[in-house]
């Protein structure tokens, strides 16, 4: 059955294109991908990202469990703040990229990918139920995806909008810090976070969902819809645009961010690791805390010794052409890899992409070729983000 977010009916009325994504019917664009993309880079946009997964861990042993099933050290951040961390399988391959919030009082909220939350929840509950070291833990694991509406407000004007709506300055919060706020009597969690490269915040509202898979929990999303429309109304003076998943993808790609299923993934069958991706290959070692034990650590240590074989690299087209997922990449006359994500940058009006290539080519400044429609087009490897960070993004100076 296709899944739907809380305010799907609003999107159905206002979006120009709705498509299935990771099992969800989601808005792809309202006006156009380019218009929405540029609104976020230059002003502010709002995304409904309620298809993202939420899993809650409660109990005295919640931290102990999470420390073992994720790669980063989530014991340090105080409540309420989050840690970017990875969940790996025993072979060191990435099951998902996640954000784990310490909510205080032995409770943790994990934000995970839209097409990974079900397998993660099943896996965590399997470990808790069957692995001896976990069976006696004081731990409750609850899937909350269908109960929480999640909206992302992104762009340089997001700071002003947060001040108007909530009376807070998000620039006084560190990245992934969160706090409880209210809007017109509706309580929600607000975090300084996002997936666009821009400044911004995300809100989490617990509410009824008319499309909840459990019919007994269905209801009208009055709180979520009110918050969504209120943000749009208050944001009019800043040029806010409702944005779909199309712009979200081009924005994350311009920022150089990885996407689960493209740059990070694991096989569903335990047969071979040819198509699996590890943090060392995906340039995500910053999310690994080596001074603890975690699932997949032994496999990663062995990979460090023997070499990773291939790595992710970002590239920008020199010749005219738009790279797409699956296109072959060449250097010095030999095939060295293939594109995992590619698009025409709405900001730069040039083709950009991410590719897996042989390890020796995974550094900036190397001329490569991308085979586009039967022709090899010149490109060069670069360091992300693709835009000038002094002019755009979280650390812009202008």
Curated annotation (Swiss-Prot):
The gene is gcvT. GO terms for molecular function: aminomethyltransferase activity; transaminase activity. It comes from Pyrococcus horikoshii (strain ATCC 700860 / DSM 12428 / JCM 9974 / NBRC 100139 / OT-3). GO terms for cellular component: glycine cleavage complex. This is Probable aminomethyltransferase. Belongs to the GcvT family. It comes from the Archaea. SUPFAM superfamilies: Aminomethyltransferase beta-barrel domain, Folate-binding domain. One of its GO terms (biological process) is glycine decarboxylation via glycine cleavage system. The glycine cleavage system catalyzes the degradation of glycine. The glycine cleavage system is composed of four proteins: P, T, L and H. Keywords: Aminotransferase, Transferase. Its EC number is 2.1.2.10. It catalyses: N(6)-[(R)-S(8)-aminomethyldihydrolipoyl]-L-lysyl-[protein] + (6S)-5,6,7,8-tetrahydrofolate = N(6)-[(R)-dihydrolipoyl]-L-lysyl-[protein] + (6R)-5,10-methylene-5,6,7,8-tetrahydrofolate + NH4(+). Transmembrane segments: none annotated.
């Amino acid at each position: 059955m296709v899944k739907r977010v809380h305010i799907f009916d609003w999107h159905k009325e206002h979006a120009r294109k709705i498509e299935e994504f990771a099992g969800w019917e989601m808005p792809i664009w309202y006006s156009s991908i380019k218009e929405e993309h540029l609104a976020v880079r230059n002003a502010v946009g709002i995304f409904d990202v309620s298809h993202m997964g939420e899993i809650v861990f409660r109990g005295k042993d919640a931290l102990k469990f999470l420390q073992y099933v994720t790669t980063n050290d989530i014991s340090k951040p105080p409540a309420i703040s989050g840690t970017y961390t990875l969940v790996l399988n025993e072979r060191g391959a990435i099951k998902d990229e996640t954000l784990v919030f310490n909510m205080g009082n032995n409770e943790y909220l994990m934000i995970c990918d839209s097409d990974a939350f079900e397998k993660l929840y099943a896996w965590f509950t399997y470990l808790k139920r069957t692995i001896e070291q976990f069976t006696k833990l004081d731990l409750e694991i609850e899937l909350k995806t269908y109960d929480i509406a999640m909206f992302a407000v992104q762009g340089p004007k997001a700071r002003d909008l947060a001040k108007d709506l909530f009376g807070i300055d998000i620039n006084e919060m560190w990245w992934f810090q969160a706090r409880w706020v209210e809007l017109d009597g509706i309580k929600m969690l607000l975090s300084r976070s996002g997936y666009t490269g821009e400044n911004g915040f995300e809100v989490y509202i617990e509410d009824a969902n008319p499309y909840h898979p459990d019919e007994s929990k269905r209801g009208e999303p009055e709180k979520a819809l009110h918050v969504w429309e209120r943000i749009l109304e208050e944001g009019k003076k800043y040029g806010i645009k409702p944005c779909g998943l199309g712009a979200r993808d081009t924005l994350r790609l311009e920022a150089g961010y990885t996407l689960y299923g493209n740059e990070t993934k694991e096989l569903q069958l335990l047969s071979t690791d040819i198509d699996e991706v590890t943090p060392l290959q995906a340039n995500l070692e910053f999310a690994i805390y080596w001074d603890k034990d975690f699932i997949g650590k032994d496999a990663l240590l062995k990979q460090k010794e023997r070499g990773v074989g291939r790595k992710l690299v970002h590239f920008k087209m020199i010749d005219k052409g738009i790279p797409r997922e699956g296109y072959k990449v060449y250097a010095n006359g030999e095939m060295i890899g293939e594109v995992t994500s590619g698009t025409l940058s709405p900001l730069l009006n040039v083709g950009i992409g991410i590719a897996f290539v042989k390890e020796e080519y995974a550094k900036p400044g190397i001329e490569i070729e991308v085979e586009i429609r039967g022709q090899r087009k010149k490109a060069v490897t670069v360091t992300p983000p693709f835009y000038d960070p002094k002019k755009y993004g979280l650390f812009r100076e202008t």
